[in-house]
Amino acid sequence: MNVLLVYAHPEPKSLNGSLKDFVVRRLEATGHVVQVSDLYAMQWKASLDENDSLDGKLGERFDPSLDSKHAYKNGRQSEDIAREQDKLRWADAVILQFPLWWFSMPAILKGWVERVYAYGFAYGVGEHSDIHWGDRYGEGMMAGKRAMLIVTTGGWESHYGARGINGPIDDILFPIQHGMLYYPGFDVLPPYLIYRTSRMDTARYARITEELGQRVDELFTAAPIGFRRQNAGAYSIPALTLKDDVAPTLSGFAAHVA
């Protein structure tokens, strides 16, 4: 199978760098074909702007959505964007690996999403009607593909627990897993999380690579997170709110997981 690893850390000799190399070796050892988008090494341009289209802005002002739509539809995107889209088409699974910085992904990775997820490619896809509101949240260009996060953080696991000061890690990652991955159609696997990264020794690193290796081995067999499909009957259309009989006692992010 084909696996794309999108990696965001500025230091090749970091823990993240070592784990990235381990994941690539493990995947290749089990017969998978791997491509790596090392965003810092690529000097990836993180800001979405009019230069993402070979035609520049279409009117007097730059319109991020409409200019993106025009560039994608007419083959006028900048080469770096088109290249990453080709990698996504090629991949059967995508891994996003990054350190948790200020409760989200590094800006360079967010910029990868913003620029590569063009109108007509990752959003603005499918019909809109009284029963179907676009191909998204379980449908879309990435449907049938898998995705997983590998995330490191310096905080303790308890800090990210149900009553932890930072908030539950599933809530922190929800905009990424549900919004950036499930939205265009990926089946999203539970993330692999590494806490207290400053407290690392040889024995702990060995345990982590053993666990991570098992997760990588199960990339195409593990059960995905049970996010509710937008167009499968759980949501009222076009309001896109859960119907009254669906998870009536729940609200917030948890309500959108079956």
Segments from the language model and where they lie:
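Structured loop/turn residues at beta-strand edges in well-structured enzyme cores
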Residues: 89, 107, 142, 186-187
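Short connector loops at secondary-structure junctions
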Residues: 37-44, 186-203
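N-terminal beta1-alpha1-beta2 submodule of the flavodoxin-like/Rossmannoid cofactor-binding fold
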Residues: 1-125, 210-258
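Short, glycine-/small-residue-rich phosphate/pyrophosphate-handling segment
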Residues: 124-182
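Short aromatic-enriched loop/helix-cap "lid" or pocket-rim segments at secondary-structure transitions
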Residues: 46-51, 160-162, 203-205
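Oxidoreductase and adenylate-handling cofactor-binding alpha/beta cores
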Residues: 174, 179-190, 194, 218
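Short, structured loop/turn "capping" segments at alpha-beta junctions
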Residues: 119-124, 157, 186-190
